Structure formats: structure tokens, C-alpha cells
Amino acid sequence: MNLVIDTNWALDLLLFDEPAAASVRAALQTGQARWLATQSMRSELARVLTYAALQKQLAARHCAAEQVLAAFDNLARLLPAAPRAPVLCSDADDQPFIDLALAHQATLLTKDRRVLATARRLAPLGARVAQRWNAVNEARGQTANKCCRPQQILKAAAPD
């Protein structure tokens, strides 16, 4: 299964100990799912990691932005930017996620209301939009696997 993961979801996956991200981590680590991304998505994550509030979160977790980006690099498969989708989002910053999901018939994980509002228009075109991985698993009759926590991902991504 192909996943496109927006920046807030990526933070839940790579930095925060968000329970909703546990089954996604497991699926990515076991190869059950593939995280599709573009260089601009990685750049957005890098930019967001410089925000003061996230710098405090990184410090509290004894983690550096570079570790989060290394974890992204280990888990995500970088692809060229996708062509513009016929379904447009009201926030242009979110459009690349929609474009990539549609181009690869992927599930887009997001909590963004504007992106979620595109779900009904994207579904007939072959892309899903979901707030939670469980919604995706339930639709496919799958169950969540156990997985490691974000700190284990970050340690695995840390350079020697």
C-alpha cells in the first residue's frame, strides 16, 4: 500500500509519541506500506522543524532536527513532483500531497480540514484521504501490528 503522509502526520510519526502513528510505523518498517514523498515535502518538514515550538519539543526529547530528517530519509521514498491533480485544495501548500496521492493511487494521511474536504472528490479518481491509519486498515480488513516507538526510529537513523 502506498501512503502519502502530510507534515503534521510526519511529525506524529517521526517525533511525537502519537499512538495513532504506531501502526503506520510498523507498516513502513515491515514493508506493508511505502511512504511516497517528494523533495519539496522533505524541505517543508525541515522548515517546520526550525519553528521555535518544535525546537523545544526536539530539545525535550534530546533529539536534533537532523535525526528526524534522517528518519524521514530512511522511511520515505523520494519521487519526482507529481503533475497537478484535477482536484484542488484551498491551501496551495497542501496541493503537492494531493497531487502525489492521486498520481500513485495512494492513501493520503492528514489531519488538515482542507485536505480532508477533498476526500469525496479524490475517491472516484483512486486516491484515499484518511485522518487515521485505522480507518484505512478497517476498510481493508487489516489489523495493526506492534512496532517500535519514534525514539527507536530516530536512534536507528542516527549516524554512527
Predicted feature descriptions by range:
Residues M1-A37:
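Short, well-structured N-terminal submotif of metal-dependent ribonuclease cores
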Residues A27-R84:
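PIN-domain endoribonuclease scaffold, especially VapC-family toxins
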Residues V24-R25, L69, F97-I98:
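Short amphipathic alpha-helical segments and helix-helix/interface helices
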Residues N2-L3, P80, L154:
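Small, basic N-terminal interaction modules of short regulatory proteins
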Residues D12-L13, L58, P83-S90:
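Short, flexible loop segments at the rims of nucleotide/cofactor-binding pockets, characterized by
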